Amino acid sequence: MAESVPITNLIELSGGSFLMGNEQDAYPADGEGPVREVFLSSFAISSTAVTNEEFKAFVADTNYVTTAEQSEDGSPPWSFVFAGLLPDDFPPTRGVLGAEWWRQVEGADWLHPEGPGSELEPECSRWNHPVVHISWFDAKAFAEWAGCRLPTEAEWEFAARGDLNQKRFPWG
């Protein structure tokens, strides 16, 4: 196995306390409440998402097979795809209750973002886009290969919020 590719776009964030979670009731079962104060030590996090090209290097180096490419029960592997990316004549499939914009698509994985027929070709302009259809297990394997670790939920929320204490969106 070749050496891992170091993540070069890490930024250091000073720790501190912040209010984590929210009590918005748009999705009551999302587990984001109650709001609680959390203290974090300083940590490093990538300033960008992992790209298709970076993930391709990981797969080429390790022969890794993602969760979306596997099937535990012999049925065809699948993943959820945003319904707005599917053709109008796409056959009805299982969705997610309360989030009907997600549709189950057989054959959707990181290399086929919208399912069969959407393969990332060698000359594709999406190699620098964020990789999709990646489970926590897939992300953890990539991070270990790259010599990093995944951020904790608190670190992720702290980084994503920036200085926007308890604001749901950047504009308020």
What are these regions (language model features)?
Residues 2-12:
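GGW-centered surface loops in extracellular recognition modules
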Residues 43, 58-67, 146-147:
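Short capping motifs at secondary-structure boundaries
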Residues 20-31, 57:
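Cytochrome P450 core scaffold surrounding the K-helix E-X-X-R motif
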Residues 12-13, 17-19, 23-25, 72-172:
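Functional-site microenvironments in short loops/helix caps that host divalent-cation chemistry
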